[in-house]
């Protein structure tokens, strides 16, 4: 750890990033070690570097994170309050901007405007037919398993965990499978470099605009029709942005949840034994993953609206604060040492907290639980095809998620992948 020791309460010059730990170090192979070293050096709020020359505060403490997420009049979600961005310290081509720049949607506002834009999302999730969604996810999962069960090998991230959520969420909006796969390709392009990103963004919005037009002409029982009818959404632009937020955010986080649950099954003998032996229910297993590896390890961001103090640190107006969801979950001030003491405990911060907490936790759990159930049933003797220490990790400062899960299993006939099938 190279972060300089600074006495609690001592202000840090906002432009000084010399020796600071890169935020990306907290999502590498051993994030717990990095979190521990940051706590030992800084306490519950640590100074880190987002990218060269761009500092931020990483909120490591559970109670401090609740303070930041619940006090909108002190900590804003609106990136237009970010001093380093406003003063040009963040370059126009920064890789931070896709996640952190202001967006004219529910993510980019606080207060009444945020509440107005959030209501359609909350109402849409409340109106989701859970049985219908589960049947849809089962069919998606079975189809994906069928594509590789006869082969005896697969990548359970690229061929499964990354595909299931987008097809399931796309289905909620009325997209068929071919449109869902095309949406997946456009999302991949979004993160493939500037030229491909622009083309991917255009295609992504084109697909959603198409379904928007179809549902305006002929409404159905899907989220697109619900958004069109919702009185709080004003015009196609707001409807489209709401769709983009739901699909992109839901896909990324649910992918990570599925991937990390499967990874634990393949690499953690204790976790696998408790789940397969019936000592750990499926929902308890999913909650253990949320405590240990939340879908977003770090979440951007809040921006101080005035000078304040947090965790013994002097926070200046315009400072950026990153929500360390994984670190806060592991805060020794609230986390018992014995994992058995966590069974049934959903006080984790995997979905954040406060007014901007995730509104889609119920469908996300349903999609994840179904995907894990069908993978375990359809691949009963699945094993990791590389040493656990050699698993690659996604190069992201935001998610602690394997880039791939190469596995091997006994080849099975296609029918074994269907819901209710298998040995």
Where are these predicted regions, by residue range?
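Cytochrome P450
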Residues: 1-423
């Amino acid at each position: 750890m190279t972060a300089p020791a600074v006495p609690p309460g001592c202000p840090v010059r906002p432009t000084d990033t010399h020796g600071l730990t890169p935020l990306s170090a907290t999502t590498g192979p051993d994030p717990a070690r990095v979190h521990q070293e940051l706590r030992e050096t800084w306490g519950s709020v640590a100074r880190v570097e987002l990218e060269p020359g761009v500092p931020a505060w990483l909120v490591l403490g559970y109670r401090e994170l609740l303070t930041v997420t619940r006090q909108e009049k002190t900590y804003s979600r609106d990136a237009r309050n970010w001093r380093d961005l406003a003063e040009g310290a963040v370059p126009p081509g920064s890789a931070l901007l896709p996640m952190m720049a202001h967006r004219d949607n529910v993510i980019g506002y606080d207060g009444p405007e945020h509440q107005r834009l959030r209501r359609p999302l909350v109402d849409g999730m409340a109106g989701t037919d859970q049985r219908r969604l589960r049947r849809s996810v089962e069919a998606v999962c079975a189809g994906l398993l069928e594509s590789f069960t006869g082969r005896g090998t697969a990548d359970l991230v690229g061929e499964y965990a990354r595909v299931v959520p987008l097809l399931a969420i796309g289905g909620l909006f009325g997209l068929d499978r071919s449109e869902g796969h095309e949406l997946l390709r456009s999302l991949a392009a979004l993160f493939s470099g500037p030229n491909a990103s622009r083309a991917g963004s255009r295609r992504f919005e084109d697909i959603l605009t198409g379904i928007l037009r179809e549902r305006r002409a002929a409404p159905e029982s899907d989220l697109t029709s619900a958004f069109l009818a919702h009185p709080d959404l004003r015009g196609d632009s707001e409807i489209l942005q709401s769709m983009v937020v739901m699909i992109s955010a839901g896909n990324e986080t649910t992918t990570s949840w599925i991937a990390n649950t499967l990874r634990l099954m393949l690499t953690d003998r204790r976790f696998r034994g408790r789940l397969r032996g019936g000592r750990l229910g499926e929902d308890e297993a999913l909650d253990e993953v949320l405590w240990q590896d939340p879908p977003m390890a770090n979440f951007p961001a809040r921006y101080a609206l005035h000078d304040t103090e947090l965790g013994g640190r002097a926070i200046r107006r315009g400072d950026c604060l990153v929500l360390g969801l994984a670190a806060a979950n592991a805060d020794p001030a609230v986390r018992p040492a014995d994992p058995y003491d966590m069974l049934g405990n959903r006080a984790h911060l995997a979905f954040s907290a406060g007014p901007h907490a995730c509104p889609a936790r119920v469908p996300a759990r349903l999609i994840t639980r179904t995907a894990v159930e069908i993978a375990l049933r359809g691949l009963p003797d699945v094993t990791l095809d590389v040493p656990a220490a050699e698993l690659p990790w996604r190069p992201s400062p935001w998610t602690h998620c394997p880039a791939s899960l190469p596995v091997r299993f006994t080849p099975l006939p296609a029918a074994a992948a269907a819901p209710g099938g298998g040995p």
